[in-house]
A protein has these predicted regions:
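Active-site glycine-rich loops that stabilize anionic/oxyanionic intermediates
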Residues: 62, 67-73
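Conserved alpha/beta-hydrolase
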Residues: 75-115
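Alpha/beta-hydrolase active-site loop
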Residues: 116-142
Length: 327
């Protein structure tokens, strides 16, 4: 292991320290020193995206941070981490992709119930071209006097390479972001995923007209988004193998520093899967940092656990220091 990698790992793995302030979010607890506002961010086609803006109540704002969700992950998962970054002086935006979370249109009648996704048109390529691209633009227009940094969790990291405006991003931090080819997943999880997607998810999606969350993902997904994801998971080079995805060329345009965090107990974003995704960013030299639960002083992290508030004095602090390194 190189001295550079050791140094990077040390940024994220150190003994637990006394919390910096009691007001930092714990779960859904209030952030005493952070202004939190639920807003609407218009996508490229004016579709309303449910979003939350986190701002420090006092002090100078030093950086803008855009947090991009994993597939079928509501933005509220990132609330604690977003609040922590805002406490440190960042303007932070979280949001839901169209057809998910608070970016799902409401039914015309019926106690604020979400509208059916049957017939709703949205693919993962649409999320990239219309939603994420617009979120980057929205942050750049409002915070143009400060570095715009990018946090991508799982799909949220993958999509950076598809953005036509990824040059606007100063630096990017990937958390459990990978090329999701099923054979690169750890065993036996790879077989469970293969069976679930092909023998449960795809048939249900074609039958119902959308992927019902109760079938295993926890959140309903638009039909086209789910089926496009399944097609990528079955390809050896994941989205890089999709000849219809012309925005793959945008991977070569991102030139900022890129650090990819690989959690060693994550069965989805294994080291080979993270390396495959990072290989697409040819105009920069991605730095891959492997972190084990022992490094963070916990028993388990996995694919989703980085964003648990228990990591605010270890993993979160290292992430924040790296994101804010550029002045």
């Amino acid at each position: 292991m190189s001295s550079q990698t050791l140094a990077a790992k040390a940024d994220f793995a150190f003994v637990r320290l006394k919390p910096e302030v009691a007001g930092v979010a714990v779960g859904e607890a209030a952030l005493d020193d952070v202004f939190v506002d639920d807003i609407i961010v218009p996508a490229a086609d004016r579709y309303p995206l449910g979003a939350t803006l986190f701002l420090p109540r006092t002090g100078r704002r030093s950086h803008a941070v855009l947090i991009n969700s994993g597939t079928a992950v509501p933005r509220k998962l990132y609330r604690g981490f977003a609040g922590y970054l805002a406490h440190r002086g960042c303007a932070v935006l979280t949001y839901d992709y169209r057809g998910t979370g608070d970016s799902r249109l409401k039914a015309v009648t019926g106690y604020n119930q979400p509208r059916s996704l049957v017939g709703f048109k949205a693919s993962m390529a649409d999320w990239a071209a219309k939603d994420v691209t617009s979120a980057v633009q929205w942050m750049r227009e409002r915070y143009g006097n400060m570095p715009l940094t990018y946090v991508g969790h799982s799909f949220g990291g993958q999509v950076l390479g598809l953005l036509p405006n990824n040059k606007e991003v100063s630096r990017a931090l990937f958390i459990a972001a990978q090329a999701g080819y099923w054979k690169l997943m750890a065993s036996p999880e790879r077989y469970r995923v293969y069976a679930m997607l092909n023998f449960v998810g795809a048939p249900l999606t074609k039958t119902f007209g959308y992927m019902p969350g109760w079938a295993g993902l926890g959140m309903d997904l638009p039909k086209d988004a789910f089926l496009q994801w399944v097609s990528w998971v079955m390809k050896e080079r994941y989205l890089f193998s999709d000849s219809t995805l012309h925005t793959r060329e945008n991977f070569h345009n991102f030139k900022g520093p890129l650090r990819a965090i690989c959690l060693t107990d994550d069965p989805w974003a294994t080291r080979p899967a993270v390396e495959l995704l990072c290989s697409g960013f040819t105009a920069t030299k991605p730095e891959i940092v492997s972190i084990s639960p022992d490094d963070a002083g916990v028993k388990k992290i996995g694919h989703m656990g980085f964003f648990r508030p228990e990591h605010r004095d270890t993993l979160w602090r290292g992430a924040a220091e790296w994101l804010q390194a550029e002045q």
